[in-house]
Amino acid sequence: MFRTMMKAKLHRARVTESNLNYVGSITIDEDIMDAVDIVENEKVQIVNNNNGARFETYVIKGPRGSGVFCLNGAAARLVQEGDVIIVISYALVAEENVKEHQPKVAVLNESNQIVEMLGTEPASTVL
């Protein structure tokens, strides 16, 4: 049996732009992608803290060091520039590996810079 487990999380990213006329996806700074092992074309879930929207899309690489989090295509209708979002990636983990599985969690500041890396979800709220 396999379980669907959180693999990576980008916590409190700020939407830098939205582009309705692009084919689709979320553009993320490649340095930030690397920090939590998210790769181009990987499926992710987006949670918008401002309006409660939850949706899925895939990732495309943005310029390194840019801090970009741009929602493209139809997803652009679910966010506004400045919204705080959470980006979550999942993986199928074999039952025998579930207890050892450690997701990578990056906490970002208002400028989309990583301010903390967590090995697991904290027991308290991270703002």
UniProtKB/Swiss-Prot annotation:
Pfam short name (any one): Asp_decarbox
Cofactor list: pyruvate
Pathway where it operates: Cofactor biosynthesis; (R)-pantothenate biosynthesis; beta-alanine from L-aspartate: step 1/1
SUPFAM superfamilies xref list: ADC-like
Co-factor remark: Binds 1 pyruvoyl group covalently per subunit.
Family under the similarity heading: Belongs to the PanD family.
Name of this chain's protein: Aspartate 1-decarboxylase
InterPro entries xrefs: Asp_de-COase-like_dom_sf, Asp_decarbox
Keyword Cytoplasm in annotation: yes
Reactions catalysed, as given in the entry: L-aspartate + H(+) = beta-alanine + CO2
Protein task: Catalyzes the pyruvoyl-dependent decarboxylation of aspartate to produce beta-alanine.
Entry comment on modification after translation: Is synthesized initially as an inactive proenzyme, which is activated by self-cleavage at a specific serine bond to produce a beta-subunit with a hydroxyl group at its C-terminus and an alpha-subunit with a pyruvoyl group at its N-terminus.
NCBIfam families membership: panD
Binding site for substrate: 57, 73-75
Any single GO CC term annotated in Swiss-Prot or TrEMBL for this entry: cytosol
Keywords: Autocatalytic cleavage, Cytoplasm, Decarboxylase, Lyase, Pantothenate biosynthesis, Pyruvate, Schiff base, Zymogen
Subunit structure as annotated in this protein's UniProt entry: Heterooctamer of four alpha and four beta subunits.
Localization of this protein: Cytoplasm
Primary site of residence: cytoplasm
Catalytic residues (UniProt): 25 (schiff-base intermediate with substrate), 58 (proton donor)
MF (Gene Ontology): aspartate 1-decarboxylase activity
EC number: 4.1.1.11
Entry-annotated residues carrying Pyruvic acid (Ser): 25
GO-annotated biological processes: alanine biosynthetic process; pantothenate biosynthetic process
Designated gene of the protein: panD
